[in-house]
Swiss-Prot record:
The record marks K7, K216 as: Transition state stabilizer. This is Acetylglutamate kinase. Catalyzes the ATP-dependent phosphorylation of N-acetyl-L-glutamate. It catalyses: N-acetyl-L-glutamate + ATP = N-acetyl-L-glutamyl 5-phosphate + ADP. Belongs to the acetylglutamate kinase family. ArgB subfamily. It is found in: Cytoplasm. The gene is argB. GO terms for molecular function: acetylglutamate kinase activity; ATP binding. Substrate binds at G43, G44, R65, N157. Its EC number is 2.7.2.8. Pfam families: AA_kinase. Coiled coil: none annotated. CDD domains: AAK_NAGK-NC.
């Protein structure tokens, strides 16, 4: 069975209750299914807390974090360090053998600079599946941060949704984007069960889909097109539904290619 990539985001990394729910669901799923799992994560809340503590400004452009040269080391420490190791510690607590990685390990995801105005922000492209497939064959849970590196050795902060998409293309994996919200909402706050590119363009033009959700929807649409299959956006809040989600039952918004 092809792997499943679970991309974690939102305040999940900042909530012990949420992490307990997630890893309990992962344990239940792994006990009843042989499907290999990979976690990809960002950690915007961890970065924001650190930046605030250091009195550094947080600037975003089109939903992407601007990352100046003097901040990339801090952001790398927050994402590839604190956020990654927090997830590894929760895996350890739940007796899941895990390995912490960043996008550059094994050239799993290739990264180039996205836009000079954004600074150290990377564009992710599929890379080599060899390392992660080896880990999956050994029964490990790879936990991959959204920090990448260019061919020139420059560290880059990559949008985690886009990083997960590139890794899914690398591995031929299915993709779930877990976030704080139950899916994409319409103008009345109701969950939209299925989303096409045309529907997304309409909601963006109407101002219903805004800011970071535009990035998330575009990443999911890109993933669906790249992978040739649907991608799910769903919430981590309903732990009892997560095993069904991991098994292919939509509980949020299903993005169609």
């Amino acid at each position: 069975m092809n792997p499943l990539i679970i991309k974690l985001g939102g305040v999940l990394l900042d909530s012990e209750e949420a992490l307990e729910r997630l890893f309990s669901a992962l344990v239940d799923y792994r006990e009843s299914h042989q499907r290999p799992l990979v976690i990809v994560h960002g950690g915007g809340c961890v970065v924001d807390e650190l930046m605030k503590g250091l009195n550094l400004p947080v600037k975003k452009k089109n939903g992407l974090r601007v990352t100046p040269a003097d901040q990339i080391d801090i952001i790398t420490g927050a994402l590839a360090g604190t956020a990654n190791k927090t997830l590894l510690s929760w895996a350890k607590k739940h007796h899941i053998a895990s390995v912490g990685l960043y996008l550059g390990d094994g050239d799993s995801v290739k990264v180039t600079q996205l836009d000079e105005e954004l600074g150290h922000v990377g564009l992710a492209q599929p890379g080599s599946p060899k390392l992660i497939n080896t880990l999956l064959e050994g029964g490990f849970l790879p936990v991959v941060s959204s920090i990448g590196v260019t061919e020139e050795g420059q560290l880059m902060n990559v949008n985690a949704d886009q990083a997960a998409t590139a890794l899914a293309a690398t591995l031929g994996a299915d993709l779930i984007l877990l976030s704080d919200v139950s899916g994409i909402l319409d103008g009345k706050g109701q969950r939209i069960a299925e989303m096409t590119a045309a529907k997304a363009e309409q909601l963006i033009s109407q101002g219903i889909i805004t800011d970071g959700m535009i990035v998330k929807v575009n990443a999911a649409l890109d993933a669906a097109r790249t992978l040739g299959r649907p991608v799910d956006i769903a919430s981590w809040r309903h732990a009892e539904q997560l095993p069904a989600l991991f098994n292919g039952t939509p509980i949020g918004t299903r993005i169609l290619a």
